[in-house]
C-alpha cells in the first residue's frame, strides 16, 4: 500500500455504513484522517459501529443532521448508492467540499495496475473472466477482482502490491465520485438506459460511465464495444489507445468474431462454440475479457482455458437445476430491460418468464417482440406487474399470472410449464421494491426452486 499524506489530519465525513463505507473509514483512519461516519438508519447496536468507534471514528446514526457540517469537513466519501440529492451530499456540494467514492481512495493507495470494467450490462462476468485469465499460471503476484463485484476496493488496495493487478468493476455510481482513477486498461461493455432515477438524464449517466477514461494517457488502453455506434463516438473522448471488440465484425482491429472464431488483431484464438456459457452477450463478454487479458500480456492458453471451463456468475444467467424436464435459471441481475432481452435471446426452448420489480417509470414496450417470440407464459410480481402484464397482452401471451411475491411466482411458473421448458427469473427491473439487493432476490428464487423440487 502506498502511504499518502492527502488525508493526514483532515476532517472527513463518510456517508453510509455499507461495506465500502466501513472499509473506507478504516483506511482513512490508518491514513491519519479524523473521521465522522453518518448513516440515516439506526445502527447504534451493530458490530460495525462498535468497531469503528473503537478505532477512533465518530459515528452518528438514525438521521442525517446537516448541522454536522459546522465541524468543517475537508472531504465527503459517500456510499455509491446514496444519491446526489441527499441532503448531506447536497450540503457538501453547496460548501464546495469534494464528494468522493471508495474507488478514489483505493486508487490513491494502490500500488497495483488497474484493469477497470464498466457498462450497463456484463460488468461482473467480464471482470470475473479477466481476473481468472490473469491468474492462470501466473508466476508472480495475483489478479484481484474487486469493486462493484462485492469485494470492497479499499480492502484489496491495502494488500495489493506492484506485482499484483486489481481488476475492478466500477458502476456509474462509483465513477461519479472519482477524480484521479487511471486504469491501465479500461473496458466499456455497453451503454443502455439505466439508473435515470439516480443520474437524472441519460447524458449524465453516459458521462458518469466515461469518467473511466478521464485520466488515461496514450500509454493506456480503452477496450470498447464497437458494435454500438454511440460507443464509437464516445471513444473519441479518450487519449488512450482504443481497442475495439466486435461480435458482429464491425472492426477487426482488436477482438472480434470471424468465421466462427474468436480473434485478436489477426490471430485466431478459439471457436466461438467452445465458450462454455450460452448467449450472444457472453460472446461479447468473452471478447472484452480476452482483449484486456491480451493487452496485459496473457497467453492464448489462459484465455482458452478460462472460456472453455467458466460456468458463469451467480445471479447472471445462472443455471440452478433441472427437475422433471424443466431447467431453472436465475438471472436476478437483470435489473433493466436490455439484460432481460439478452436472456430471452439466449434460449431456443420455450420460456416461462418470471419478471417484475421496482417501478422506475419505464415503459416495457421494447420487450413486446421478444416476449412474443420466446415466452409461452409469464408470471409477474412487484410494482411493475401491471405494466408488464399490459406488455405481455400486447405480445399475445395467453398465460399471464399476477402474484404478490416472488415466492408465489416460482410454483406458479412450474404449474404453467411442461417438460422441455426453461423457467427463467429475469425481472427486467431493480429489486428494491421487495428486496435489499438483486443477490437477495436471486437467493429467494433459488430457495423457492429448491422447495418445489425437493
Swiss-Prot record:
ATP binds at residues 119-125. InterPro entries: Mur-like_cat_sf (IPR036565), Mur_ligase_C (IPR004101), Mur_ligase_C_dom_sf (IPR036615), Mur_ligase_cen (IPR013221), MurD (IPR005762). It is an enzyme of class 6 (ligase). GO terms for biological process: cell division; cell wall organization; peptidoglycan biosynthetic process; regulation of cell shape. Transmembrane segments: none annotated. It catalyses: UDP-N-acetyl-alpha-D-muramoyl-L-alanine + D-glutamate + ATP = UDP-N-acetyl-alpha-D-muramoyl-L-alanyl-D-glutamate + ADP + phosphate + H(+). Keywords: ATP-binding, Cell cycle, Cell division, Cell shape, Cell wall biogenesis/degradation, Cytoplasm, Ligase, Nucleotide-binding, Peptidoglycan synthesis. Pfam families: Mur_ligase_C, Mur_ligase_M, MurD-like_N. The keyword Electron transport does not apply. One of its GO terms (molecular function) is ATP binding. The keyword Transmembrane helix does not apply. It is found in: Cytoplasm. SUPFAM superfamilies: MurCD N-terminal domain, MurD-like peptide ligases, catalytic domain, MurD-like peptide ligases, peptide-binding domain. GO terms for cellular component: cytoplasm. Pathway: Cell wall biogenesis; peptidoglycan biosynthesis. Its EC number is 6.3.2.9. NCBIfam families: murD (TIGR01087). Cell wall formation. Catalyzes the addition of glutamate to the nucleotide precursor UDP-N-acetylmuramoyl-L-alanine (UMA). Belongs to the MurCDEF family. This is UDP-N-acetylmuramoylalanine--D-glutamate ligase. It comes from Latilactobacillus sakei subsp. sakei (strain 23K). The lineage of its organism: Bacteria, Bacillati, Bacillota, Bacilli, Lactobacillales. The gene is murD.
Amino acid at each position: 500500500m502506498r502511504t499518502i499524506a492527502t488525508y493526514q489530519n483532515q476532517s472527513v465525513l463518510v456517508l453510509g455504513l455499507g461495506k465500502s463505507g466501513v472499509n473506507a473509514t478504516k483506511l482513512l483512519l490508518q491514513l491519519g484522517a479524523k473521521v465522522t461516519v453518518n448513516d440515516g438508519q439506526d445502527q447504534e447496536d451493530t458490530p460495525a459501529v462498535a468497531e469503528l468507534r473503537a478505532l477512533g471514528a465518530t459515528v452518528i446514526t438514525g438521521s442525517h443532521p446537516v448541522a454536522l457540517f459546522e465541524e468543517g469537513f475537508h472531504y465527503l466519501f459517500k456510499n455509491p448508492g446514496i444519491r446526489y440529492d441527499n441532503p448531506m451530499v447536497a450540503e457538501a456540494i453547496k460548501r464546495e467540499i469534494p464528494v468522493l467514492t471508495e474507488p478514489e481512495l483505493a486508487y490513491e493507495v494502490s500500488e497495483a495496475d488497474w484493469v477497470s470494467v464498466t457498462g450497463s450490462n456484463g460488468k461482473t462476468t467480464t471482470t470475473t473472466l479477466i481476473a481468472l485469465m490473469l491468474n492462470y499460471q501466473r508466476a508472480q503476484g495475483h489478479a484481484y477482482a474487486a469493486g462493484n463485484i462485492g469485494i470492497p476496493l479499499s480492502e484489496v488496495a491495502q494488500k495489493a502490491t506492484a506485482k499484483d493487478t486489481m481488476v475492478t468493476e466500477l458502476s456509474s455510481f462509483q465513477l461519479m465520485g472519482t477524480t484521479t482513477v487511471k486504469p491501465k486498461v479500461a473496458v466499456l461493455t455497453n451503454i443502455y438506459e439505466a439508473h435515470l432515477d439516480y443520474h437524472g438524464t441519460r447524458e449524465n449517466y453516459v458521462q458518469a460511465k466515461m469518467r473511466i477514461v478521464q485520466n488515461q494517457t496514450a500509454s493506456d488502453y480503452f477496450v470498447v464495444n464497437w458494435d454500438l455506434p454511440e460507443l464509437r463516438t464516445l471513444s473519441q473522448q479518450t487519449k488512450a489507445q482504443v481497442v475495439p471488440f466486435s461480435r458482429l465484425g464491425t472492426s477487426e482491429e482488436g477482438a472480434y468474431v470471424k468465421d466462427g472464431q474468436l480473434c485478436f488483431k489477426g490471430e485466431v484464438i478459439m471457436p466461438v462454440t467452445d465458450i462454455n456459457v450460452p448467449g450472444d452477450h457472453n460472446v461479447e463478454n468473452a471478447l472484452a475479457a480476452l482483449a484486456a487479458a491480451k493487452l496485459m500480456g496473457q497467453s492464448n492458453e489462459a484465455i482458452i482455458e478460462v472460456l472453455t471451463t467458466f460456468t458463469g456468475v451467480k445471479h447472471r444467467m445462472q443455471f440452478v437445476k433441472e427437475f422433471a424436464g424443466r431447467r431453472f435459471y436465475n438471472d436476478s441481475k437483470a435489473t433493466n430491460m436490455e439484460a432481460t432481452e439478452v436472456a430471452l435471446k439466449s434460449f431456443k426452448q420455450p420460456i416461462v418468464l418470471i419478471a417484475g420489480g421496482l417501478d422506475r417509470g419505464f415503459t416495457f414496450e421494447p420487450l413486446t417482440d421478444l416476449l412474443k417470440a420466446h415466452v409461452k407464459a409469464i408470471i409477474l410480481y412487484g410494482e411493475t406487474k401491471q405494466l408488464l402484464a399490459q406488455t405481455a397482452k400486447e405480445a399475445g401471451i395467453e398465460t399471464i399470472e399476477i402474484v404478490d411475491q416472488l415466492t408465489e411466482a416460482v410454483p406458479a411458473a412450474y404449474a404453467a410449464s411442461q417438460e422441455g421448458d426453461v423457467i427463467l427469473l429475469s425481472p427486467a427491473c431493480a429489486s428494491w421494491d421487495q428486496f435489499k439487493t438483486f443477490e437477495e432476490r436471486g437467493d429467494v428464487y433459488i430457495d423457492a426452486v429448491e422447495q418445489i423440487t425437493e
